[in-house]
Amino acid sequence: MKKNRVWAVFYPIFVYYLISAFVFFALNILLGETQEIYMLKQAVSSGATIPVLFALWKQDNEVERVVYGKEKRPLGQYVVQAVLACTAAGTFGVALNNFIAMTPLVQVSEGFQTANENFFGGGVWMQVLASCVVVPVAEELLFRGIVLKRVALFAGETIGSIYSALLFGLIHVNLVQFIYAALLGALLAVIVVKTKRVSLAVLGHATANLIAIFRTASGVLDFSYQPTLAGIGFSVVMVAIGMVAMLALVHTLQKTGTGKLAS
């Protein structure tokens, strides 16, 4: 039984890696390995995994709906929750980036430097397509839609959230991105556990990435990377705004209640 549980959690990750690695390898052969098209290859290879991940997520979701029923919630409530989830993820992402940049980790991590060069090697619109549309859908379906849910079935939502966050961090390989992805993943897991909507994690993930792209392209928040009073103060304010947004999100749920993990 335990082996079956482990397999149920990890085989979607293996499938994700096999498909994305195969497509990325094929694109390397066809298009070459220049930084200018790295995000294009990332978008295509991640996009190739979405049909399979969606099918697995939908299968789990249908079983759950048969057991617990389908809960209908008004569109207005969803819009409010989406705004709050995006605010929480966006501000928390800004603060995380700032606090990590204030440490020596960014300078000493060669893996992060390489990943950063690849990420920002192409045009802004390709960065937006890959990291704000395709990748958030694929990664949230996998980690918050499938892994979290499957672990939660036998270990509870707290353990499911921790596992999904840690595994999400591990796929980013280098230490800097592991810390950022694991902590942001934990927040996204809380959003899914509280709201029962994976789509809100997708929106939050996309928002955090979009802000990262915007601030890098514009340089508008460069001061907040520095361990100065202004940089630290701004980052603390971002955390505070994120916490208020999360509390407001929970408050909207207390009015209506929610069911089991759903869409």
Would you name each region that the model predicts?
Residues 1-18, 62-95, 153, 229-236, ...:
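Interfacial transmembrane-helix boundary/kink motif in multi-pass membrane proteins
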Residues 12-62:
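Alpha-helical transmembrane segments in multi-pass membrane proteins
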Residues 17, 21-26, 165, 177-230:
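Functionally important transmembrane alpha-helices
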Residues 17-25, 48-55, 86-95, 233-254:
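Hydrophobic core of alpha-helical transmembrane segments in multi-pass integral membrane proteins
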Residues 32-38, 66-135, 153, 222, ...:
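Juxtamembrane helix-loop-helix connectors linking adjacent transmembrane helices
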Residues 138-163, 190-197:
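Membrane-interface helix/loop boundary segments of multi-pass membrane proteins
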Residues 157-172, 206:
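Small-polar-interrupted transmembrane alpha-helices in polytopic inner-membrane proteins
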Residues 206-263:
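C-terminal membrane module of polytopic membrane proteins
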